[in-house]
């Protein structure tokens, strides 16, 4: 397995994709269309191109993980895209996903992510308990349709379920954009990962973590802290507190990568929406 740095907007350590080599090369998450030049370069470095890929395995359909899927299939019609049952319809018809993302990112959408193309239904495969020799298991919380994957050698491809950690910093940011953050489900997902006792975590943001037990507890602690701050404080207070923590743990460039991988204002919005939905449910 090899990590490909997708160099989002020309910056390293923001978004990564994992290449599974073998008779049928596969990517776990592909990043957005805006990162396709770096993806091509990463594949070329190991004597591959998009046409060699046979499978794309998705943790979830957020644009920084799956935005290029439609373009890749257009270029390579033999490519099979493996995704959760909930996520599959949004690949086939990404209109709702794109409208939601354009509301969130506004005029920056195209620069950040590039075009979002549909994946033909015949190229989509709904993930069961196993795919390509990987154990697939649900890890909702960051997204309701989120999946993680465990390899036979103990690597957990955890998507965003295990948060964001930009090396060399040890800080873990539970990035939590709208629309369907669920803190309780997320904690159960951390339990599900820990129960499998992985030897390492493979993070799209960013890289391989060799202390998974400590990392997962850091993620859980930060999630609880961030959730409480969003419940009781303003956006400005939330952002300021998280910025101070990140800046204390990272150099200036790495702190900037944290922000690019998961803007803090969006995490506030996602967690605030979570609390608002809970209050609406309680009042009903």
Model-assigned labels for residue ranges:
Residues 55, 82-94:
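A short, structured active-site edge motif that brings together acidic residues
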Residues 1-46, 50-52, 149-160:
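Conserved beta-strand hairpin/beta-sheet module of binuclear metal-dependent hydrolase folds
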Residues 32-34, 52-64, 90-138, 144-213:
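Metallo-beta-lactamase
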Residues 211-221:
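Histidine/acidic-residue-rich catalytic or RNA/ligand-binding cores of hydrolases
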Residues 229-284:
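C-terminal regulatory/interaction regions
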Residues 67-76:
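Metal-dependent catalytic neighborhoods of phosphoester/phosphodiester hydrolases
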């Amino acid at each position: 397995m090899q990590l490909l740095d997708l160099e989002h907007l020309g910056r390293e350590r923001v978004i990564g994709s994992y290449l599974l080599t073998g008779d049928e090369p596969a990517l776990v998450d592909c990043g957005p269309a805006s990162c396709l030049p770096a993806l091509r370069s990463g594949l070329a470095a190991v004597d591959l191109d998009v046409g060699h890929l046979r499978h794309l395995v998705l943790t979830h359909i957020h644009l920084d993980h799956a935005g290029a899927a439609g373009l890749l299939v257009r270029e390579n019609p033999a490519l099979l895209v493996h995704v959760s049952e909930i996520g599959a319809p949004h690949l086939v018809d990404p209109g709702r996903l794109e409208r939601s993302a354009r509301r969130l990112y506004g005029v920056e959408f195209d620069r950040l992510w590039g075009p979002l193309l549909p994946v033909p239904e015949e190229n989509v495969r709904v993930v069961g308990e196993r795919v390509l020799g990987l154990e697939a298991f649900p890890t909702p919380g960051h997204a309701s349709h989120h999946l993680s994957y465990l390899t036979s050698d103990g690597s957990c491809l955890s998507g965003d379920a295990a948060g964001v950690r930009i090396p060399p910093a040890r800080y873990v940011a539970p990035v939590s954009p709208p629309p369907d953050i669920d803190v309780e489900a997320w904690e159960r997902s951390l339990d599900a990962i820990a129960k499998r006792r992985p030897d390492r975590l493979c993070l799209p943001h960013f890289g391989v973590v060799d202390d998974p037990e400590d990392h997962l507890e850091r993620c859980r602690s930060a999630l609880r802290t961030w959730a409480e701050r969003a419940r009781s404080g303003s956006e400005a207070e939330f952002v300021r507190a998280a910025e101070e923590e990140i800046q204390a743990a990272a150099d200036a460039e790495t702190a900037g990568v944290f922000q690019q991988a998961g803007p803090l204002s969006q995490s506030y919005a996602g967690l605030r929406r979570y609390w608002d939905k809970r209050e609406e449910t309680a009042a009903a």
